[in-house]
Design a protein with these regions (language model features):
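Transmembrane-helix boundary motif in ABC transporter permease subunits
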Residues: 2-8, 74-106, 119, 123-127, ...
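Interhelical loop and adjacent transmembrane-helix boundary motif
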Residues: 3-11, 41-42, 55-61, 205-262, ...
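Membrane-interfacial helix termini and adjacent extracytoplasmic/periplasmic loops
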Residues: 4-5, 43-44, 48, 52, ...
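Loop-to-helix entry region at the N-terminal start of transmembrane alpha-helices
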Residues: 15-16, 64-68, 126-150, 191-192, ...
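Transmembrane alpha-helices
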Residues: 17-27, 144, 151-154, 177-206
Length: 303
C-alpha cells in the first residue's frame, strides 16, 4: 500500500476518534442526567430500580411553570410575527442605507448579554408595578431577543429575485399592495416564516439569563424552575425536570432539522442566491442565443 494512503487512513481514523470523543463528552452528561431522573437513587444507579415518581413530583410542583412557558412562547411568537414579517419585507425592499443600519440595530440584542437587556428593561419599565409583575414583562424581553431571528429569516426570502419579479408582474396586472402582500409575498415567504417561528419558540422556551432577571415568584418559567430544582432539591428531582425540559424542546429542534431550518436564515439566503444565479445564467444564455436567431433574418433582408 502506498505511503500516502497509509497516512490518509491514520488521519481519517484520528479525526473519527476525536469526533467520537467530543460527541461522548457532550452526550454522556445528558444520558446520565436522564438516568438520574428515572432511578430511585442516583448514587446506586440502575440497581436501585427505575421509577417515574420524580417526574410525577416535578409535574405536580412545576406544571404552572410549564404552562406559563408555553403561554409566553406563543405570545412572543404572535408579536414577532406581527412585527417581524412586515419589518423584514420593508428591509428587503428598501435600498436606503438606513435600512442596513436598522437591520444591524435589530441584531444588537443578540450580541449583548441577556442580563444587559434585562437591566435596560428594568430601568425603564420596572416602575410599572402591574406590568413588572405580569408575564408580559418577560414577553417584552423575549420579543427583543428573538425578533432578529424572525426578521433575518423572512428578509432572506423576501430578498429573492424571483419574488421581486412575481410582485412586479402582479403590479403590472393591477394588483394592489395588499393583494400582492397577501397572495404573493406571504405564501412565498412561508419557509422563512416557519424557520423564524421555530427559532422563536425554541429560544423563548429555553431562554434563562434574560428571564431570570425579569421573573417574579408568580412568573417562574421552565428554565428558572430548572435552576431552582437543581439548587434546592434532590438531584433526582432536578434530573427529572431536565427530562421534562427535553420533552418540550427536542420536538422543536427535531422539526428544525427535519425542515432544514437555519435560525439565522443562512440556508434560505443560500437558496435565494442559487435561484438568482440560475436566473442570471438563463438571461445570459438567452442574450447569447439572440444574435444567432436574428442572423438569418438579417441576411434575408440584405438579399
Amino acid at each position: 500500500m502506498p505511503e500516502f494512503l497509509k497516512l490518509r487512513r491514520v488521519l481519517v481514523g484520528g479525526q473519527l476518534l476525536v469526533t467520537l470523543l467530543l460527541v461522548a463528552f457532550m452526550v454522556v452528561p445528558v444520558v446520565m442526567s436522564v438516568m438520574a431522573g428515572l432511578t430511585v437513587n442516583y448514587f446506586r444507579g440502575v440497581s436501585s430500580g427505575l421509577t417515574l415518581k420524580w417526574l410525577d413530583q416535578v409535574w405536580t410542583m412545576y406544571q404552572g411553570s410549564v404552562w406559563l412557558s408555553i403561554e409566553i412562547a406563543l405570545a412572543t411568537l404572535a408579536i414577532t410575527l406581527a412585527i417581524g414579517v412586515p419589518a423584514a419585507y420593508a428591509l428587503a425592499r428598501s435600498r436606503s442605507r438606513w435600512s442596513r443600519i436598522t437591520e444591524e440595530l435589530l441584531v444588537l440584542p443578540i450580541a449583548l448579554p441577556g442580563l444587559a437587556t434585562a437591566l435596560a428593561l428594568l430601568s425603564v419599565y420596572g416602575g410599572w408595578s402591574a406590568f413588572r409583575s405580569s408575564m408580559w414583562f418577560i414577553v417584552a424581553g423575549h420579543v427583543v431577543f428573538t425578533l432578529p431571528f424572525m426578521v433575518r429569516s423572512v428578509a432572506a426570502v423576501c430578498a429573492g429575485t424571483d419574488l421581486r419579479i412575481m410582485e412586479e408582474g402582479a403590479a403590472s396586472l393591477g394588483a394592489s399592495f395588499s393583494q400582492r402582500f397577501l397572495t404573493i409575498v406571504l405564501p412565498n415567504a412561508r419557509p422563512g416564516i416557519v424557520a423564524g417561528a421555530l427559532a422563536v419558540l425554541t429560544l423563548s422556551i429555553g431562554e434563562f439569563n434574560l428571564t431570570w432577571m425579569l421573573h417574579t415568584p408568580d412568573t417562574k418559567t421552565l428554565p428558572v424552575g430548572l435552576a431552582d430544582a437543581y439548587a434546592s432539591m434532590r438531584l433526582e428531582v432536578g434530573s427529572a425536570y431536565t427530562i421534562l425540559f427535553l420533552l418540550m424542546t427536542l420536538p422543536l429542534l427535531i422539526a428544525m432539522q427535519w425542515l432544514g431550518v437555519d435560525p439565522a436564515g443562512a440556508q434560505t439566503a443560500r437558496a435565494a442566491a442559487r435561484r438568482k444565479r440560475a436566473l442570471l445564467r438563463q438571461e445570459t444564455l438567452e442574450q447569447a442565443a439572440l444574435p444567432l436567431s436574428t442572423t438569418p433574418n438579417t441576411a434575408e433582408t440584405a438579399r
